[in-house]
């Protein structure tokens, strides 16, 4: 993709990685693997990949701004927990669209925290993303408030999807701030470092030993997570948080195509 800016290339690769991750999250959940176990497996694979790469490159593991890196890990864990619940309880494209309210949240938070300007184009994208999310969730809202028989989905899952998007927006702003001084792999490393121990208590009593197919799906969740996280962090280094995350809207397209092909 030589005709695209480097930041756009990174963010599109990130969008593809996250879309494939969401697909295998959905497939793993369909096998009866608990959401938090999927999250822990993702964190374990990402932790190993990040650790090996950092050690091989001679890069210090813990970075310099440890407090902000830890906060990024915690907020990312919260965003992912909410997002995974939405992905496993809603159609893939619908969950993805809700998650992609996060560029709107990123733009607003970036304005207040990073002092990034919100131009007319960015503002238009915010309005359109909110309208899109409302259009998608309207049938469920209508169905919950009337006797009209429409296809409805869990309002809790919808609320969690929106909450996950808000937390993702906050995490992206933190990543942008960290990317000025920290190595991308160090930023990525802190997420599984926090998420793995944090997720274990939530699935310990209902742990499921996956079969071979489930094991492969879980490994792929972690691998595609790493692709998405690393390229997203690199893209954030080169572009403002609001503009960089706008490219991630392509994940909606990727998720829809993958959903049609693999999930009918």
Residue locations for each model-derived region?
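Juxtamembrane helix-loop boundary signature in multi-pass membrane transporters
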Residues: 1-10, 107-166, 180
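Cytoplasmic-side transmembrane-helix entry/capping segments in multi-pass membrane proteins
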Residues: 6-13, 64-75, 118-131, 157, ...
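Hydrophobic/small/kink-forming positions within alpha-helical transmembrane segments
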Residues: 15-23, 51, 73, 77-81, ...
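Specific transmembrane alpha-helical segments of multi-pass solute transporters/efflux pumps
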Residues: 20, 58-96, 135, 223-239
């Amino acid at each position: 993709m030589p005709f695209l800016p480097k930041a756009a290339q990174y963010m599109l690769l990130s969008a593809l990685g996250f879309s494939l991750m969401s697909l295998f999250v959905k497939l793993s959940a369909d096998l009866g693997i608990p959401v938090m176990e999927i999250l822990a497996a993702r964190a374990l694979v990402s932790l190993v990949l990040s650790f090996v790469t950092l050690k091989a490159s001679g890069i210090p593991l813990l970075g310099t701004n440890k407090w902000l890196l830890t906060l990024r890990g915690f907020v990312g864990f919260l965003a992912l927990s909410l997002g995974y619940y939405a992905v496993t309880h809603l159609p893939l494209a619908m969950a993805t669209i809700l998650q992609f309210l996060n560029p709107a949240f990123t733009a607003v938070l970036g304005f207040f925290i990073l002092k990034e300007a919100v131009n007319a184009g960015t503002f238009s994208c915010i309005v359109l993303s909110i309208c899109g999310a409302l259009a998608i969730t309207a049938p469920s809202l209508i169905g919950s408030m009337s006797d009209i028989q429409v296809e409805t989905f869990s309002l809790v899952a919808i609320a969690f999807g929106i909450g996950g998007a808000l937390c993702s927006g906050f995490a992206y702003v933190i990543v942008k701030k960290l990317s000025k001084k920290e190595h991308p792999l160090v930023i990525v490393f802190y997420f599984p470092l926090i998420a793995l121990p944090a997720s274990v208590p939530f699935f310990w009593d209902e742990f499921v030993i996956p079969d071979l197919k489930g094991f492969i799906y879980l490994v792929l969740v972690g691998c595609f997570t790493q692709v998405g996280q690393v390229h997203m962090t690199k893209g954030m280094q080169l572009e403002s948080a609001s503009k960089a995350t706008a490219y991630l809207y392509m994940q909606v397209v990727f998720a829809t195509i993958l959903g049609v092909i693999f999930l009918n």
